[in-house]
Protein backbone atom coordinates (compact mmCIF):
# COMPACT_ATOMS: atom_id res chain seq x y z
CA UNK A 1 0.00 0.00 0.00
CA UNK A 2 1.18 3.51 -0.84
CA UNK A 3 -0.60 6.58 0.54
CA UNK A 4 -1.44 9.33 -1.96
CA UNK A 5 -1.62 12.31 0.36
CA UNK A 6 -1.74 15.28 -2.01
CA UNK A 7 -4.18 16.01 -4.80
CA UNK A 8 -1.27 16.28 -7.23
CA UNK A 9 0.05 12.81 -6.33
CA UNK A 10 -3.44 11.30 -6.53
CA UNK A 11 -4.10 12.84 -9.94
CA UNK A 12 -0.68 11.90 -11.28
CA UNK A 13 -1.09 8.29 -10.12
CA UNK A 14 -4.45 7.96 -11.85
CA UNK A 15 -3.14 9.56 -15.05
CA UNK A 16 -0.05 7.34 -15.13
CA UNK A 17 -2.08 4.19 -14.51
CA UNK A 18 -4.61 5.13 -17.21
CA UNK A 19 -1.82 5.81 -19.69
CA UNK A 20 -0.17 2.45 -18.92
CA UNK A 21 -3.27 0.25 -18.72
CA UNK A 22 -3.17 -2.60 -21.21
CA UNK A 23 -6.43 -4.51 -20.67
CA UNK A 24 -9.03 -2.90 -18.40
CA UNK A 25 -9.86 0.18 -16.38
CA UNK A 26 -12.81 -0.01 -14.00
CA UNK A 27 -13.84 3.10 -12.10
CA UNK A 28 -16.59 3.85 -9.63
CA UNK A 29 -17.36 7.32 -8.24
CA UNK A 30 -20.08 9.04 -6.27
CA UNK A 31 -19.32 12.44 -7.86
CA UNK A 32 -18.03 13.06 -11.38
CA UNK A 33 -17.97 16.77 -12.23
CA UNK A 34 -17.50 18.43 -15.59
CA UNK A 35 -14.78 20.70 -14.23
CA UNK A 36 -11.03 20.46 -14.95
CA UNK A 37 -10.54 17.17 -13.10
CA UNK A 38 -13.64 15.52 -14.54
CA UNK A 39 -12.60 16.46 -18.07
CA UNK A 40 -8.98 15.35 -17.54
CA UNK A 41 -10.17 12.01 -16.15
CA UNK A 42 -12.61 11.51 -19.04
CA UNK A 43 -9.89 12.30 -21.57
CA UNK A 44 -7.49 9.83 -19.93
CA UNK A 45 -10.12 7.08 -20.05
CA UNK A 46 -10.94 7.87 -23.68
CA UNK A 47 -7.23 7.73 -24.62
CA UNK A 48 -7.01 4.31 -22.99
CA UNK A 49 -10.12 3.14 -24.86
CA UNK A 50 -8.56 4.35 -28.12
CA UNK A 51 -5.59 2.04 -27.38
CA UNK A 52 -7.98 -0.91 -27.01
CA UNK A 53 -8.35 -0.89 -23.22
CA UNK A 54 -11.84 -1.90 -22.05
CA UNK A 55 -13.12 0.93 -19.84
CA UNK A 56 -16.09 0.53 -17.49
CA UNK A 57 -17.45 3.42 -15.43
CA UNK A 58 -20.13 3.46 -12.73
CA UNK A 59 -21.30 6.83 -11.40
CA UNK A 60 -24.03 7.54 -8.88
CA UNK A 61 -26.99 9.29 -10.46
CA UNK A 62 -27.43 11.85 -7.70
CA UNK A 63 -24.28 13.81 -8.52
CA UNK A 64 -23.67 13.37 -12.25
CA UNK A 65 -23.10 16.82 -13.75
CA UNK A 66 -22.25 15.74 -17.28
CA UNK A 67 -24.60 16.86 -20.06
CA UNK A 68 -26.53 14.17 -21.93
CA UNK A 69 -24.45 14.54 -25.09
CA UNK A 70 -21.19 14.13 -23.15
CA UNK A 71 -22.27 10.87 -21.50
CA UNK A 72 -23.67 9.46 -24.72
CA UNK A 73 -20.60 10.39 -26.76
CA UNK A 74 -18.35 8.54 -24.31
CA UNK A 75 -20.68 5.56 -24.12
CA UNK A 76 -20.81 5.22 -27.92
CA UNK A 77 -17.12 4.33 -27.98
CA UNK A 78 -16.90 0.54 -28.54
CA UNK A 79 -14.45 0.12 -25.64
CA UNK A 80 -16.36 2.23 -23.10
CA UNK A 81 -19.27 1.20 -20.92
CA UNK A 82 -20.99 3.68 -18.61
CA UNK A 83 -23.59 2.70 -16.06
CA UNK A 84 -25.51 5.02 -13.79
CA UNK A 85 -26.28 3.76 -10.30
CA UNK A 86 -29.91 4.11 -9.20
CA UNK A 87 -30.98 6.52 -11.98
CA UNK A 88 -33.97 8.27 -10.45
CA UNK A 89 -32.65 11.83 -10.08
CA UNK A 90 -30.97 13.09 -13.19
CA UNK A 91 -29.56 10.94 -15.99
CA UNK A 92 -32.27 10.13 -18.50
CA UNK A 93 -35.04 11.09 -16.05
CA UNK A 94 -37.46 13.87 -17.06
CA UNK A 95 -37.98 16.62 -14.44
CA UNK A 96 -41.57 15.65 -13.65
CA UNK A 97 -40.49 12.04 -13.04
CA UNK A 98 -37.69 13.19 -10.68
CA UNK A 99 -40.16 15.04 -8.48
CA UNK A 100 -42.53 12.08 -8.53
CA UNK A 101 -39.71 9.69 -7.56
CA UNK A 102 -38.71 11.86 -4.60
CA UNK A 103 -42.31 12.23 -3.41
CA UNK A 104 -43.34 8.60 -3.77
CA UNK A 105 -40.15 6.54 -3.36
CA UNK A 106 -37.87 8.32 -0.89
CA UNK A 107 -36.24 5.09 0.32
CA UNK A 108 -35.52 3.92 -3.22
CA UNK A 109 -34.29 7.34 -4.33
CA UNK A 110 -32.00 7.60 -1.30
CA UNK A 111 -30.06 4.38 -2.04
CA UNK A 112 -26.66 5.66 -3.15
CA UNK A 113 -23.34 4.22 -4.33
CA UNK A 114 -20.58 6.06 -2.49
CA UNK A 115 -17.59 3.97 -3.63
CA UNK A 116 -14.51 5.62 -5.09
CA UNK A 117 -12.33 3.11 -6.90
CA UNK A 118 -9.94 3.16 -9.85
CA UNK A 119 -8.82 -0.34 -10.88
CA UNK A 120 -6.31 -1.00 -13.67
CA UNK A 121 -5.82 -4.39 -15.32
CA UNK A 122 -7.19 -6.04 -12.18
CA UNK A 123 -3.76 -5.63 -10.60
CA UNK A 124 -3.45 -2.09 -9.25
CA UNK A 125 -6.13 0.02 -7.61
CA UNK A 126 -6.66 3.40 -6.00
CA UNK A 127 -9.33 4.00 -3.40
CA UNK A 128 -9.98 6.66 -0.80
CA UNK A 129 -12.03 9.78 -0.27
CA UNK A 130 -11.55 11.57 -3.58
CA UNK A 131 -14.34 12.03 -6.09
CA UNK A 132 -13.73 13.25 -9.66
CA UNK A 133 -13.97 16.99 -9.05
CA UNK A 134 -11.52 19.89 -8.69
CA UNK A 135 -12.05 20.33 -4.95
CA UNK A 136 -10.83 16.77 -4.26
CA UNK A 137 -7.49 17.30 -6.04
CA UNK A 138 -6.52 20.77 -4.74
CA UNK A 139 -7.64 22.44 -8.00
CA UNK A 140 -10.47 24.58 -6.65
CA UNK A 141 -9.51 28.23 -6.10
CA UNK A 142 -12.03 28.69 -3.26
CA UNK A 143 -12.29 25.44 -1.30
CA UNK A 144 -10.58 22.04 -1.33
CA UNK A 145 -11.32 18.89 0.65
CA UNK A 146 -8.50 17.26 2.56
CA UNK A 147 -8.64 13.65 1.39
CA UNK A 148 -6.26 10.76 1.03
CA UNK A 149 -6.13 7.80 -1.28
CA UNK A 150 -4.31 4.49 -1.11
CA UNK A 151 -2.67 2.78 -4.06
CA UNK A 152 -3.05 -0.97 -3.63
CA UNK A 153 -1.84 -4.20 -5.23
CA UNK A 154 -2.51 -7.84 -4.43
CA UNK A 155 -5.57 -9.33 -2.74
CA UNK A 156 -7.08 -5.95 -1.90
CA UNK A 157 -7.25 -5.16 -5.62
CA UNK A 158 -8.93 -8.49 -6.35
CA UNK A 159 -11.49 -7.81 -3.62
CA UNK A 160 -12.16 -4.31 -5.01
CA UNK A 161 -12.64 -5.74 -8.48
CA UNK A 162 -15.14 -8.30 -7.15
CA UNK A 163 -17.07 -5.47 -5.49
CA UNK A 164 -16.98 -3.45 -8.71
CA UNK A 165 -18.36 -6.46 -10.59
CA UNK A 166 -21.25 -6.79 -8.12
CA UNK A 167 -22.15 -3.13 -8.67
CA UNK A 168 -21.73 -3.46 -12.45
CA UNK A 169 -24.14 -6.41 -12.63
CA UNK A 170 -26.61 -4.99 -10.11
CA UNK A 171 -30.09 -4.22 -11.46
CA UNK A 172 -29.60 -0.73 -9.97
CA UNK A 173 -26.70 -0.03 -12.38
CA UNK A 174 -28.26 0.91 -15.72
CA UNK A 175 -26.41 1.37 -19.00
CA UNK A 176 -26.46 5.04 -19.95
CA UNK A 177 -27.56 4.28 -23.52
CA UNK A 178 -30.56 2.35 -22.17
CA UNK A 179 -31.56 5.35 -20.05
CA UNK A 180 -31.66 7.63 -23.09
CA UNK A 181 -32.95 5.17 -25.69
CA UNK A 182 -36.61 6.06 -25.23
CA UNK A 183 -36.05 9.82 -25.22
CA UNK A 184 -34.77 10.23 -28.79
CA UNK A 185 -31.36 11.44 -27.62
CA UNK A 186 -29.31 8.36 -28.39
CA UNK A 187 -28.27 9.22 -31.95
CA UNK A 188 -29.09 12.93 -31.97
CA UNK A 189 -25.96 15.04 -32.46
CA UNK A 190 -23.72 12.49 -30.75
CA UNK A 191 -20.40 11.62 -32.34
CA UNK A 192 -17.26 9.99 -30.97
List the predicted regions and their residue ranges.
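HKD-type phospholipase D/PLD-like phosphodiesterase module
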Residues: 1-21, 31-192
